[in-house]
Amino acid sequence: MAPPAKRARRGLVPPGYKYLGPGNSLDQGEPTNPSDAAAKEHDEAYAAYLRSGKNPYLYFSPADQRFIDQTKDATDWGGKIGHYFFRAKKAIAPVLTDTPDHPSTSRPTKPTKRSKPPPHIFINLAKKKKAGAGQVKRDNQAPMSDGAVQPDGGQPAVRNERATGSGNGSGGGGGGGSGGVGISTGTFNNQTEFKFLENGWVEITANSSRLVHLNMPESENYKRVVVNNMDKTAVKGNMALDDTHVQIVTPWSLVDANAWGVWFNPGDWQLIVNTMSELHLVSFEQEIFNVVLKTVSESATQPPTKVYNNDLTASLMVALDSNNTMPFTPAAMRSETLGFYPWKPTIPTPWRYYFQWDRTLIPSHTGTSGTPTNIYHGTDPDDVQFYTIENSVPVHLLRTGDEFATGTFFFDCKPCRLTHTWQTNRALGLPPFLNSLPQSEGATNFGDIGVQQDKRRGVTQMGNTDYITEATIMRPAEVGYSAPYYSFEASTQGPFKIPIAAGRGGAQTDENQAADGDPRYAFGRQHGQKTTTTGETPERFTYIAHQDTGRYPAGDWIQNINFNLPVTNDNVLLPTDPIGGKTGINYTNIFNTYGPLTALNNVPPVYPNGQIWDKEFDTDLKPRLHVNAPFVCQNNCPGQLFVKVAPNLTNEYDPDASANMSRIVTYSDFWWKGKLVFKAKLRASHTWNPIQQMSINVDNQFNYLPNNIGAMKIVYEKSQLAPRKLY
């Protein structure tokens, strides 16, 4: 007889928990709640301390502080007890200052006592000193992986790694020649790591790094700009060409990594969608390092010669909106995120946001003789909200060689499926019983169930007939819904197209025919366009959703009449002529069946140009889905990261002389890197047949390769090819 299996040691763990309590083992499976997850992380840190020869039980350690921070808002009784226990320990126990060999990734980086630099630093210093350069000094701190917990958006940490030197360059005391070169302060990493866990789970760590180029802003001022293209909307039928709005143009730029192509290459995405069934968004962190600031001057000779010099006293301004104070402006909707090619330098997008502006546009139908009416009301004084970064968000000043880390933000989002559903209402439940079956092979027209339609059993909602058919049998819910398709609505600030969730409807699978709600992306060379000429039309693609939850606008009809009456023109909605002779109206413009019985899938991840996460609306009634991103952050989302080259003034600056400052032309190159962590569930096979997966053939393989001058494109990839049943 085989010996009994050894059970994991539970220790003094209260009911309902697996790790909250002393003496338990670290193999209890998934934690039961956030407090239990914090306890598991705490236990792992203690184990690391013990392995390194330190006793965390007699000292107050960083792991204890981390547990206090993670349970400060705990609602469960165990988390509350643990929180106050370690607060009491903090008050009486001596502090354990040394960190374990593998510290956690969720504690703020703080300046610590300077440690002895490695030997190669002294060798480099000796060489520089011999050449006449200054010495390098460095504040030794932990790398970005030791960033801060970011429950409310993150607490940034700045590390100064600045070189000092005499230099012979011009422009703000900048260093030129052989001086002013700092020590490399980070690593360039674009690998995607897959860690296979228990019970079919996979931890996916996407690393991304980019060289970012940032020019100084055209102006140091905030500007309120009114955009008015009334020449277009003055023509009847052109309401959809309306561009009128007001925006605040700022001197800052936005570093936005919120797009799938920033994090995954095409091969990574193929592996994910072919083997995983769902994605969970876990955490996000980012860092700026190896900051370089340079000035540009021109000689007086003809033709003029530009001279570039390192400026060790110029500053890069960095602000992290960790509390989401500023308007949320995801750049993926304008295809202005960081670029998708790790080996190509990229630029951040100039940051701007909408400002309140009332107007009325009364359109004219193309078949009428009237002209559109445009009335501009201006800004309502009750609605003015002018935001400035300088007085709303802490701003950090970085100089050559400095670093900035945001810390780690942990997401609270619902998971995203990587499978699609094929069942519509006609495929739900138990099919009708067939009294007889086909007797010959290949029969395709077996049309008789064998029981008269008024003699069948079952449930319908037809009160005036006894017929039970596949059309009348009662289904549990409605899969998908009829939406206002291609409809525009008026708002106080102008018309907008109604968003609808993407879904496959009818037979529309041609990418040139927009199916129900399928998004269409236009993008440039940073984000997948192959052409190398300037000023070209952006490349485009339409992402056809696989979910069978849409409608077929070109061929749908809706009948709303008594069952036993003939169909009349005023009681049926057809694709054309839906209401008593009025032509040119699609029924989906005026009919909406969304209700409490509607079943709908989330939007798919759109690789590479789609947005990953979105911010939850601050409204009492919140939308259940957002059509631009599969992950909607509950309560808070990662803080937006803003950068700006600080004003580098000349001695001629006079604040009263001109609206434009007298500045030295200065720009910055810096390295950005980030880490985005997912948890994914491996997809299990439950069917006999193999399924379609993301693949390529010999012909389209070359879409992923550069040509002889380096031009290449990123082809969009499907994310929900694998089918699943929904009922």
UniProtKB/Swiss-Prot annotation:
Notes on the domains: The N-terminus of VP1 is sequestered within the mature capsid. It contains a phospholipase A2-like region and putative nuclear localization signals.
Basic residues biased stretches: 1-10
Subunit architecture: Interacts with host TFRC.
Protein name: Capsid protein VP1
Biased amino acid composition, Gly residues: 166-183
GO CC terms: host cell; host cell nucleus; T=1 icosahedral viral capsid
Comp. bias intervals (Polar residues): 25-35
The organism's taxonomic lineage, starting at the top: Viruses, Monodnaviria, Shotokuvirae, Cossaviricota, Quintoviricetes
Stated family: Belongs to the parvoviridae capsid protein family.
Native source organism of the sequence: Feline panleukopenia virus
Keywords associated with the record: Capsid protein, Clathrin-mediated endocytosis of virus by host, Cytoplasmic inwards viral transport, Disulfide bond, Host nucleus, Host-virus interaction, Magnesium, Metal-binding, Microtubular inwards viral transport, T=1 icosahedral capsid protein, Viral attachment to host cell, Viral penetration into host cytoplasm, Viral penetration into host nucleus, Viral penetration via permeabilization of host membrane, Virion, Virus endocytosis by host, Virus entry into host cell
Region (Phospholipase A2-like): 19-64
Coiled-coil region list: none
Pfam families, per the entry: Parvo_coat, Phospholip_A2_4
Disulfide partners: 633-637
Binding sites annotated in the UniProt record for Mg(2+): 323
Motif mapping: Nuclear localization signal: 4-13
Region (Disordered): 1-38, 95-184, 507-536
